[in-house]
């Protein structure tokens, strides 16, 4: 805790009466709370004031936080104080008597810095200069310092008192202690027994004090002072140890000899009164006199001791001088005797030298002559050796591989023979490596849990034509990854989008728009990218991607590639994608380089392409993924990993080499020492022998001893030769300069001997460290090998993700590869850029050295030969004929080696002098272990098929349409897709028919279905009908073609879905048949769409378009469908239609209104009033059988209409409407997905699972990944209303079985089993779903007979008179419509109201209580008679308002327009009104007359028409709702003026939709 004004700071405690809910002021710095702001403010100011000090260091002038930080750092610094020094330092502190802390610190630091204590960790400097961390086991005192020097004084000597006249108290104290200090042992004389901290080192060793040191900053004055501050305090003016520290470390019981073998030091005492330079306050005058007398006596005592020591020293000096003089005289006498003896010997030696001088000169001349002869012979040998070395140097120089004269034949590799064409095999390997390297980044394991292999996946994908095979999975993986990554990048661009000005400046800086070609390409790509939005209602990424639509989505993606390159994301592309532009897109490059392939995709399935064409597509998709930001970041991360792994591997190798060098040097040193010892022993023996011979023969043979000595001296030459044998590396240097090097060699021998003797002790020290057991060495070696292997694996995996490059090239320029994904050593024979002369052996320029330029030819690099392959070479006799080299015309191929024996042969045959082969050989030797490990798992059968299986497999991969149709593998993909499309068309038609969502407008449905099922497509084009308008298909197609001749060309974008058959193929039958099949199947889908009632279609094909375009998405969808040129395009339109159908309205999903359960369709009847399902056993009273004719539920029964509460009894219509809508089933409401997930609904297990999956679709955003590509079949294809399903994977089983739709139970079974039966007709049980529940009434008129023929099967099944016989749903003709009632039918002319009737018929929705003359005639009669009997008009107003609010087209009129959303609305509309206002007036009985109510309604419509243009969705909804209002008003007997009925407001053409 910091000190406040150098006093402890105490926090303020919280008040005792503090309430839990009381508001207080909290000070975060001191963790205190205050009730009053003034206290809080005062404490805050105090914390920020410089009045605090650190409690540890005592540093003043700090703020509270600074003091806390100072304490933290000081305590952290104290943690590093050596623990073995704590007790010794405290013990020494206890011996001091100082009044200042820094004086104690100086005394202790001066004593401790040169002494080291037991258990202390120090650094020992070894003999070789390295530092070793050791622990002190024992402190050894010097042996010669025992006794008096070690402080063991006798009591008599220690108590001698000498009187001194000094009156200085400090001199007294220092002199007294000096008597002991002079005898203190020098700290450098101590020795220490240390033990290394590493266990593998030796146990212990004794070192000198000069070899020991503490680590830097481990023990310093500052740290010691900080430590003493924590454990010391001032007591009576003297610094003493705190009582807590004294007792905690047991200082009183400690013995200093345990820490250091010397007597404890005696420190200088400093008087306490000198602390501040002022006399102490507590000492009296009497005490001062006593202290002064004691100090005087002590000074006298010290002076006497000093005088005594001085006299003793003088006596000792006199004795020593006398002894030295005596020894000097004895030495002089001995020297004189030796001198005389030496002079006698010199005289005798002079005489002997004169006698042998002549013989010595003769021998010397003979020796010189022999020496000259030997020197000549050596010079001759040296010259020959130099020439040979020059020859070897020239011969071993690197050269062109084909110029080497010792080339060996390379082992013949096995050619690769697989189902793939040879030219595709290399690209297949590239795709395989890409998938293995980047599969983790793009979640490859989701599509291929077992991984991607060459034989099982890639070969089958490229050769086979199965639409559900590996090619589908691969393309789905690529497109999914691309779409996902592009969506993520779009989000990042949106976040980082810059201003328009900056974007413009950046675009101009990058100069992207300067190239008109790029601009044109980007414009075309943008046009192609907009096509799916215009014709399918969603973007390309949102289309349903499955095996059937894959070809078309792939083609659209290729065409739209480059559309994302805009000026808005220029900065992002420049910063994150390396300046990516449209021409960098691999798919755009494919589109530009292979336009025929893109055109072929428009009419052919991708599964029927050739392997080469498939590989081009896969190659382009790989290139597309490589340009993404995520891939670039992934590669950069692995580049960093590779760099780090290589650095670690280099360090590991350097460490291994260092250890090996040290071990080798130690062995060499030991051998040299042994040889040196032997030589010294021999020299000693020779010297002794020579001395004996000299003494024996000196008198008989004069000069013999001298001659032998000379011979001995010349033996240094032999010694020189021996030394040369020890150091063979310097032989040539000695031979080059024999005179000088010989003398220096002699000197070096002596120096080496001296150095070896000096280092012998160091070697012995090193040998002590070496003893490692064999098991430990083996374990260490295995650990290093394991670490090296892990680093190599890490490097290889990083290389696979960054840059795979060949091992090298041989003499024939063949590349050698090893791949991480497949085992084996592969050879690529690529002859591009080579000429024939480059593959032929050429004479080496080394053999004919006549021309100086030949060596230059022999050492040309590989690049120089490639660059000069077209130039002429000077080759002796061929110089006169200058011929251009011929390029090599050979197909590229791949080969492989399959065994380690072949690898050994290859390494042996490679030439070490060639440029390419030397590098290849070195690489193969380095990678030999890894290659052999791969070859051990290599299967030769996968890469080399026999000829017979290869021939048998060719027909499988061909696109024969006449092959057996029974076997799917023998079918072409086009045929497979055709059969599947027929199944799906029949299935969706059956689901629409069974679900009462509509019916195809043909004479006989069964004939139509059998024609489609049996492939008799010519029977499909009998006639087509759209919502009652009979129109032949030929007329329809002709109209479409005449209307859109230019539109199709513009929309198809360079060949999108062209109808013209391909003229490339010479066979006219196959393309024609395919075109006809596509045309008829598209026509069948068109007929199915025409048969769906408009009210059961939702976005994007709901026909509502809020924009200003006169064509809706549905219109463009129809145009695109009829101009489809491939089956995949038809599949794409089918998925869009399936996504747009309101399957929740299907009767197959009907739910009982009472028990809220699905199923048991045989016992379910539909109410003719509300179209709600009711089980016969749930109705009260129960129904014994399905009733004939009309049946109404209890709520819709006419007699119960009067029981409804009047408007006066209900506070608001809103609550009633909400209550009724809450009771309605989720099949009637589009936005009631929350009800589907309620746990209180007890449904069948399969149905509940489907409901849960549908809820997930509605609540969660669509995901791009999918578990499978196949199209499973399910009868209930519901979609979430808010989040429509994008793809097949989110709606498993979109296309149900036609044979399993009799009951909802069967549909559940079919959905769970995912089965599809393609050849069975629908059973008759499906007809009984609604049979008997209602009766069908027909008019005898001729016109009605036509509709009976066309629509009677559907009206019987569905029983919807409102859909078939009401004026809203009757078929339309030129100027008439059929108005059918129970009593009469009449033809009403439609001049201006024809469009209103059509729009109204499309706007009807299920689940609404519709009042028509046919379905509920009784209420109509009661209403008409009620008005005649005086019934109040408010009941009619109330009923009409409810009908208007519940109408689907009432959404623009429910509430007033918000002024915030539409600011200018109230500037144009002066009298705004809405249905909620009208409803409030009805509830408050504000309408006195019917005309007021009708005027408000008409004012609402006139406001809509005045503000919104005619073609907007709001105006269309107003038109339909106004027509509905007029009809209902007439039915209720309300009078609407003709002028109001005929009133049609002309909206402003320039206004846009505001609501």
Swiss-Prot record:
Q: Which GO terms describe its biological process?
A: chromatin remodeling; nucleosome assembly; positive regulation of DNA replication; regulation of DNA replication
Q: Where is the WAC domain?
A: 22-128
Renumbered to this chain, the Basic residues biased-composition regions fall at 1263-1277
Positions of the region Disordered? 652-751, 843-874, 944-969, 1203-1429
Note the InterPro entries from the entry: Acf1_Bromo, BAZ1A, Bromodomain, Bromodomain-like_sf, Bromodomain_CS, DDT_dom, WHIM1_dom, WHIM2_dom
The similarity comment for this entry is: Belongs to the WAL family.
Query: Would you tell me the protein name for this molecule?
Result: Bromodomain adjacent to zinc finger domain protein 1A
């Amino acid at each position: 805790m910091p000190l406040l004004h150098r006093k402890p700071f105490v926090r303020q405690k919280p008040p005792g009466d503090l309430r839990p809910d009381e508001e207080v002021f909290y000070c975060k710095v001191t963790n205190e709370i205050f009730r009053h702001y003034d206290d809080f403010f005062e404490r805050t100011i105090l914390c920020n004031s410089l009045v605090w000090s650190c409690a540890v260091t005592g540093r003043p002038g700090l703020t509270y936080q600074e003091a806390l930080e100072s304490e933290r750092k000081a305590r952290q610094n104290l943690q590093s104080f050596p623990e073995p020094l704590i007790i010794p330092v405290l013990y020494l502190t206890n011996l001091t008597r100082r009044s200042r802390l820094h004086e104690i610190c100086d005394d202790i630091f001066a004593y401790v810095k040169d002494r080291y204590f037991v258990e202390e960790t120090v650094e020992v400097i070894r003999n070789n200069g390295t530092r070793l961390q050791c622990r002190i086991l024992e402190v050894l005192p010097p042996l010669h310092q025992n006794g008096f020097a070690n402080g063991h004084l006798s009591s008599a000597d220690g108590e001698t008192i000498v009187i001194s006249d000094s009156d200085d108290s400090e001199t007294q104290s220092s002199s007294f202690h000096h008597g002991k200090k002079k005898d203190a042992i020098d700290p450098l004389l101590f020795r220490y027994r240390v033990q290394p901290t590493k266990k593998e080192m030796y146990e212990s060793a004794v070192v000198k004090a000069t070899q020991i040191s503490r680590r830097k900053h481990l023990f310093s004055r500052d740290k010691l002072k900080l430590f003493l501050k924590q454990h010391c305090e001032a007591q009576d003016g003297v610094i003493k140890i705190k009582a807590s520290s004294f007792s905690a470390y047991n200082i009183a019981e400690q013995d200093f000899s345990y820490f250091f073998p010397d007597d404890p030091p005696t420190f200088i005492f400093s008087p306490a009164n000198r602390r501040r330079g002022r006399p102490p306050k507590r000492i009296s005058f009497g005490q001062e006199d006593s202290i002064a007398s004691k100090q005087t006596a002590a000074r006298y005592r010290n002076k006497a001791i000093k005088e005594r020591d001085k006299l003793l020293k003088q006596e000792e000096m006199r004795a020593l001088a006398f002894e030295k003089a005596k020894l000097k005289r004895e030495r002089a006498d001995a020297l004189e005797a030796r001198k005389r003896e030496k002079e006698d010997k010199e005289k005798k030696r002079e005489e002997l030298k004169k006698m042998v001088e002549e013989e010595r000169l003769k021998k010397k001349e003979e020796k010189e002559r022999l020496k000259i002869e030997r020197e000549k012979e050596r010079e001759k040998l040296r010259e020959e050796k130099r020439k040979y070395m020059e020859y070897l140097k020239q011969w071993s120089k690197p050269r062109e591989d084909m110029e080497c004269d010792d080339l060996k034949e390379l082992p013949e590799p096995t050619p690769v023979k697989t189902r793939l064409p040879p030219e595709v095999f290399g690209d297949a390997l590239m795709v395989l490596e890409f998938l293995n390297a980047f599969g983790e980044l793009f979640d490859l394991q989701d599509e291929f849990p077992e991984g991607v292999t060459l034989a099982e996946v890639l070969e089958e994908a490229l050769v086979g034509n199965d639409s559900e095979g590996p090619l589908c999975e691969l393309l789905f993986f690529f497109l999914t990854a691309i779409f996902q990554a592009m969506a993520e990048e779009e989000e990042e661009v949106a976040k980082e989008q810059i201003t328009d000005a900056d974007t413009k400046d950046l675009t101009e800086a990058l100069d992207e728009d300067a190239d008109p070609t790029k601009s044109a390409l980007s414009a075309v790509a943008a046009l192609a990218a907009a096509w799916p939005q215009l014709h399918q209602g969603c973007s390309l990424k949102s289309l349903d991607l499955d095996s059937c639509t894959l070809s078309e989505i792939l083609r659209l993606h290729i065409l739209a590639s480059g559309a994302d390159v805009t000026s808005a994301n220029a900065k992002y592309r420049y910063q994150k994608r390396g300046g990516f532009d449209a021409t960098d897109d691999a798919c755009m490059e494919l589109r530009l380089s292979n336009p025929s392939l893109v055109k072929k995709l428009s009419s052919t399935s991708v599964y029927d392409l050739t392997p080469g064409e498939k590989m081009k597509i896969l190659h382009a998709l790989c290139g597309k993924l490589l340009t993404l930001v995520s891939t670039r970041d992934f590669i950069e991360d692995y580049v960093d990993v590779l760099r780090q792994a290589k650095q670690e591997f280099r360090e590991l190798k350097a460490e291994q080499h260092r250890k090996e060098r040290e071990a080798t040097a130690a062995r060499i040193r030991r051998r040299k020492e042994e040889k040196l010892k032997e030589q010294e022993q021999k020299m000693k023996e020779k010297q002794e022998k020579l001395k004996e011979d000299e003494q024996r023969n000196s008198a008989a043979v004069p000069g013999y001893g001298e001659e032998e000595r000379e011979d001995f001296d010349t033996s240094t030459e032999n010694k020189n030769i021996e030394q040369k044998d020890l150091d063979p590396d310097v032989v040539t240097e000695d031979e080059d300069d024999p005179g000088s090097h010989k003398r220096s060699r002699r000197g070096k021998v002596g120096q080496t001997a001296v150095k070896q003797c000096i280092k012998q002790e160091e070697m012995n020290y090193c040998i002590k460290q070496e003893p490692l057991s064999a098991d430990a060495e083996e374990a260490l070696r295995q650990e290093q090998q394991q670490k090296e292997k892990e680093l190599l694996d890490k490097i290889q995996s990083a290389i696979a993700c960054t840059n795979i490059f060949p091992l090298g090239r041989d003499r024939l320029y063949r590349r050698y590869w090893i791949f991480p994904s497949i085992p084996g050593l592969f050879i690529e024979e690529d002859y591009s850029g080579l000429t024939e002369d480059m593959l032929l052996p050429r004479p080496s320029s080394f053999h004919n050295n006549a021309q100086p330029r030949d060596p230059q030819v022999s050492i040309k690099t590989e690049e120089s030969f490639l660059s000069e392959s077209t130039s002429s070479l000077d080759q002796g006799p061929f110089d006169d004929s200058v011929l251009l080299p011929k390029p090599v015309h050979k197909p590229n191929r791949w080969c492989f080696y399959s065994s380690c024996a072949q690898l050994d042969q290859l390494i042996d045959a490679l030439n070490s002098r060639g440029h390419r082969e030397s590098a290849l050989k070195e690489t193969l030797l380095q990678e030999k272990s890894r290659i052999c490990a791969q070859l051990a798992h290599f299967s030769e059968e996968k890469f080399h098929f026999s000829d017979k299986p290869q021939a048998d497999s060719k027909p499988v991969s061909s696109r024969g349409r006449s092959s057996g149709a029974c076997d799917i593998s023998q079918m072409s993909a086009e045929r497979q897709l055709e059969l599947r499309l027929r199944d799906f068309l029949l299935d969706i038609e059956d689901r629409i028919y069974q679900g009462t969502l509509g019916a195809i407008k043909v004479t006989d449905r069964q004939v139509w279905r059998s024609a489609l099922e049996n492939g008799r497509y010519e029977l499909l084009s009998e006639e087509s009908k759209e919502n009652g308008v009979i129109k032949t298909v030929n007329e329809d197609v002709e109209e479409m073609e005449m209307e859109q001749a230019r539109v199709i060309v513009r929309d198809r974008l360079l060949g999108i879905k062209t109808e013209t058959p391909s003229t490339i193929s010479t066979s006219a039958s196959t393309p024609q048949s395919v075109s006809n099949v596509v045309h008829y199947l598209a026509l069948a889908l068109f007929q199915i769409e025409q048969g769906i009632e408009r009210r059961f279609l939702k976005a994007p094909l709901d026909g509502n378009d809020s924009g200003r375009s006169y064509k809706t998405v549905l219109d463009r969808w129809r145009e695109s469908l009829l101009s489809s040129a491939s089956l995949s395009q038809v599949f794409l339109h089918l998925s869009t239609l399936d996504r747009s159908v309101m399957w929740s309205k299907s009767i197959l999903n009907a739910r009982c209104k009472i028990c809220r359960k699905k199923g048991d369709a045989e016992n379910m009847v539909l109410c003719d009033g509300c179209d709600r399902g009711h089980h016969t056993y749930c109705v009260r009273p129960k129904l014994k059988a399905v009733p004939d004719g009309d049946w109404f539920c209890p709520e819709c029964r006419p007699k119960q209409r009067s029981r409804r509460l009047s408007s006066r009894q209900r506070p608001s219509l809103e609550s009633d409407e909400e209550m009724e809508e809450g009771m309605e089933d989720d099949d009637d409401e589009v936005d009631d997905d929350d009800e589907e997930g309620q746990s209180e609904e007890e449904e069948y297990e399969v149905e509940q699972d489907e409901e849960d999956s549908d809820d997930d679709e509605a609540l969660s955003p669509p995901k791009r990944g999918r578990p499978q590509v196949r199209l499973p079949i399910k009868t209930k294809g519901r979609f979430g209303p808010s989040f429509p399903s994008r793809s097949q994977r989110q709606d498993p089983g979109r296309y149900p079985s036609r044979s399993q739709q009799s009951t909802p139970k069967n549909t559940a079974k079919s959905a769970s089993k995912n089965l599809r039966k393609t050849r069975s007709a629908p059973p008759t049980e499906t007809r009984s779903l609604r049979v008997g529940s209602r009766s069908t009434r027909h008019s005898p008129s001729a016109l009605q007979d036509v509709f009976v023929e066309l629509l009677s099967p559907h009206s019987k099944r569905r029983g919807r008179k409102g859909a078939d016989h009401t004026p809203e749903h009757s078929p339309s003709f030129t100027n008439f419509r059929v108005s059918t009632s129970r009593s009469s039918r009449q033809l009403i002319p439609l001049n201006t109201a024809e469009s209103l009737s059509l729009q109204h018929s499309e706007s009807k929705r299920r689940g609404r209580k519709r009042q028509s003359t046919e379905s509920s005639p009784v209420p109509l009669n009661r209403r008409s008679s009620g008005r005649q009997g005086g019934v109040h008009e408010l009941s009619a107003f109330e009923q009409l308002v409810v009908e208007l609010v519940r109408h689907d087209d009432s959404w623009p009129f429910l509430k007033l327009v918000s002024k915030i959303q539409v600011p200018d609305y109230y500037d144009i509309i002066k009298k705004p009104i809405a249905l909620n206002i009208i409803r409030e007036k009805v509830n408050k009985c504000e309408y006195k007359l019917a005309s007021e109510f009708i005027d408000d309604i008409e004012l609402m419509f006139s406001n809509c028409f005045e503000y919104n243009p005619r073609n907007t969705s709001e105006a269309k909804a107003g038109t339909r709702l106004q027509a509905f209002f007029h009809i209902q008003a007439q039915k209720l007997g309300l009078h609407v003026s003709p002028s109001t009925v005929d009133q049609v407001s002309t909206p402003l053409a320039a206004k846009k939709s505001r609501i």
